[in-house]
Structures are given as C-alpha cells and as structure tokens.
C-alpha cells in the first residue's frame, strides 16, 4: 500500500493545506460511517471490457447497474463534465472531461438520482460517443466509482493521483481502502499457465492487489491475485493480451444497495 504519498506539487500553501486537511477529514468520515454499520459511500463498477473478456460470467448474471454499457443504454440523457479532482490538482495526464452523468427514467413517478449544480455545464453526448469515452478510460486504467447505490447517476473515472476519494485512502495507508471502498461483486483471477509474467497488470493495479511469485518451470515470476485486496475493478484484465486474467463473480446481488441516492446520503448525515 502506497502510504505517505507526497503532497501535490505546484500548489499554493493554501492549496497544500486544503488537500492535507481534506485527506484526513474524508477518511475519518468514511471510518465513522463504517463503524456505525452504514453501507460504504462509494462503490466500484467493474470495467465492462473486463466483463466481456470473462467467459465464466454469464451475461444474465450481470446487473444493469454494474455494467457501464447497460447503464448508458438505460439513460435518457448522457453527459460528461469536468472532473473536479483532476481539473484542480492536474497531477497526471489523464483526460479531465470524463466525469459521467446519466439520467434514468423515474421509478413509480419518483426520481431516485442526485440533483447537481455545475460551475461548467456538462456536455450532452450520444450513446456511441459515451461508450467511446468509457472504453478510452478503461484502457487508460481509470476506475469507475459512483455512490454506493444502484441509482448513482454520477460516475467518476478515477485515477489514484488526483481522486479525492482514492488518494486520501491510499495516503492513510494501513489497508484502509480495502475496508472502506465497497468492491464490485467481482474479483480478478489469473490462469498462471497463460501468464507470461509481463508485469503490465502489476503496474495498472491501484489497490496493491497483485504480486508476482516464482512458479516452477517459469523463467519469469508470474501474477498472483491477493484476493483480500482485490476490489474487482477489472483494470488488470483489460490490458492482459494473453487473456490470463479474467473476472469471477463472488458476491450476491444484495451486495449493492438499491436505495435512492438521497437515502444513502441522509443515512450518512445521521452518524
């Protein structure tokens, strides 16, 4: 786990102070939420390219709100807006205008999504345009993170350098991120007979869930998944050219809360 990450470079003293304070405050809030027995505030949506590359997963077992392509198909309106984290910190070269907002039809006359206010209005896009952006994000190794509900309509495409959710957890260290960030219903699995030990997956994993081990008969160490650390994002699967990595389904549908966004947020305010 990459604890004690350096503060952002190029920021004013006030900016550095804010980022340090934020990293402490948000993680303390997440810990308090967990200790109160409440569901985590954020969850992982697996890469849809990784799901497609996993023949052991039957399409009928994939919930629509854990498949980026199905989420886009169900949306009445699709927009992208500037990532507040990456737009502010500019610590990496990943694209900035990739925070996804979708609008789902009301259920029984009730809108269960989230009301948003913007500094810069989002840009509406077509399904095909949105899917192209999502595919690009997945190939770059970004992780889909919405609020932890089936009705989360704002989905960030997160890096570990700038994200104001991932970065504070990684900075705190001690395995906090494995305890607080709600994993997807999936977990990576490796076929070591197909693995050639290229190390691409090791570099792409943001959650220290991959290590290399010596395997009898192999000149190179091969990939091993640390199961208790894997959050099921599928980032490692996407770039495995030998198809040695896939996802497996390990959790029930009840793992993802089906409450509204407002209910999830109001529960947090009661802690």
Regions from the PLM with identified roles:
Residues 30-183, 187:
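Catalytic cores of enzyme domains
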Residues 142-151, 175-204, 208-232, 250-254:
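Ferredoxin-like iron-sulfur electron-transfer modules
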Residues 1, 88-90, 251-257:
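Flexible glycine/acidic-rich beta-alpha junction loops that bind and position SAM and/or redox cofactors
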Residues 1-3, 232-233:
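Short, cationic-aromatic polyanion-contact patches
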Residues 222-271:
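Flanking helices and flexible, charged tails adjoining ferredoxin-like Fe-S electron-transfer domains
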Residues 2-25:
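Short, amphipathic alpha-helical interaction segments positioned at domain boundaries
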Residues 165-170, 202-208, 212, 237-243, ...:
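Cys/His-rich zinc-coordinating "finger/knuckle" motifs
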Residues 83-85, 156-158, 163, 195-201, ...:
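Short cysteine clusters
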């Amino acid at each position: 786990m990459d604890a004690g990450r350096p503060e952002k470079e190029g920021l004013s003293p006030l900016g550095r102070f804010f980022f340090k304070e934020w990293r402490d405050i948000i993680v303390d809030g997440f810990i308090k939420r967990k200790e109160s027995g409440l569901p985590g505030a954020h969850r992982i949506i697996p890469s849809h390219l990784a799901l497609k590359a996993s023949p052991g997963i039957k399409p009928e077992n994939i919930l629509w709100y854990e498949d980026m392509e199905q989420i886009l198909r169900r949306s009445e309106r699709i927009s992208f807006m500037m990532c507040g984290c990456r737009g502010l910190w500019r610590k990496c070269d990943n694209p900035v205008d990739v925070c996804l907002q979708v609008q789902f039809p009301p259920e029984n006359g009730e809108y269960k999504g989230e009301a948003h206010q913007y500094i810069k209005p989002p840009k509406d896009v077509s399904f095909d345009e949105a899917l192209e952006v999502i595919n690009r994000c997945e190939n770059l190794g970004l992780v889909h993170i919405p609020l932890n509900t089936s009705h989360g309509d704002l989905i960030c495409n997160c890096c570990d350098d700038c994200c104001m959710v991932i970065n504070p957890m990684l900075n705190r260290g001690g395995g906090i991120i494995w305890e607080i960030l709600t994993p997807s219903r999936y977990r990576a699995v490796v076929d070591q007979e197909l693995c050639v030990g290229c190390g691409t997956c090791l570099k792409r994993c943001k959650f220290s869930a991959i290590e290399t081990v010596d395997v009898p008969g192999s000149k190179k160490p091969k990939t091993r998944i640390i199961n208790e650390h894997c959050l099921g994002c599928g980032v490692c699967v996407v770039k495995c050219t030998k198809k040695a990595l896939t996802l497996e389904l390990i959790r029930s549908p009840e793992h993802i809360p089906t409450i509204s966004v407002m209910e999830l947020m109001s529960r947090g305010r009661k802690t």
